[in-house]
A protein has these predicted regions:
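Short, Lys/Arg-enriched N-terminal segments with co-localized hydrophobic residues
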Residues: 1-9
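Short, glycine-rich nucleotide/cofactor-binding loops
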Residues: 26-36, 65-66, 113-114
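Histidine-anchored nucleotide/phosphate-binding helix
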Residues: 37-49, 55
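Short internal beta-strands
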Residues: 53-59, 137-140
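N-terminal beta-loop-helix "entrance" segment that forms/cooperates
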Residues: 62-75
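A glycine-rich helix N-cap at a beta->alpha junction
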Residues: 73-110, 114, 118
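A charged, amphipathic interaction segment
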Residues: 103-160, 164
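Short hydrophobic/aromatic patches at helix-to-coil boundaries
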Residues: 175-178
């Protein structure tokens, strides 16, 4: 039985596929500045707490493994986006995203806010993940689809497909889709 009361259906304890309570897997599907933080914060925190962490980067999350990143944020589709300004919070309506240069401005504001508040950059968090032995897998299909080469990626990543992730996920206690 799982702690939630569910039943194991894939295997039993003796088959070698038992769920390890000290494991976490994360599917990383988004690569914008704001969406890059949750998987790296959760992954590095879990690793620091002694969990074995695997991150599977696919589709728009795959560029987070590139040696050179140029992360941006946009108000488009970010209805909850409010930037601290002049003692309050400035709402960034979706329509504003249609104005040329707004994404660049929003990205610069967000990067300044991150730096001002002493929050680690994505590059720093990614390096922490490497140092903490977080297993990072780039999706082979996505690499092929978007014409990425492994030499464009940071050192130490693996390349694998959905089956590689599923093998990890079926043994992980915590599975996140971000």
């Amino acid at each position: 039985n799982f702690p939630s009361g569910g039943q194991k259906t894939m295997s039993d304890e003796n088959s070698g596929n038992a769920i390890d309570p000290n494991t976490m897997s994360i599917i990383v599907t988004k690569g914008s500045l704001d969406w890059a933080y949750p998987p790296f914060i959760l992954g590095t925190t879990a690793a620091a707490m002694g969990l074995e962490v695997t991150m599977f980067f696919t589709f728009y999350g795959l560029p987070l493994l590139l040696k050179k990143m140029d992360l941006k944020v946009t108000p488009l589709g970010n209805a909850a986006m409010k930037m601290p300004m002049m003692g309050g919070h400035m709402v960034m309506p979706n329509i504003v995203a249609a104005i040329p240069g707004v994404d660049a401005m929003a990205s610069k504001m967000m990067k300044n806010l991150i730096k001002k508040n002493g929050v680690a950059s994505i590059e720093e968090l990614r390096e922490l993940a490497v140092e903490a032995d977080v297993r990072m897998i780039g999706c082979q299909m996505t690499m092929d689809l978007f014409d990425y080469q492994k030499d464009q990626m940071i050192d130490g990543i693996e390349v694998g497909g959905a089956a590689t992730y599923i093998e990890v996920a079926t043994k992980s206690h915590i599975n996140l889709f971000i």
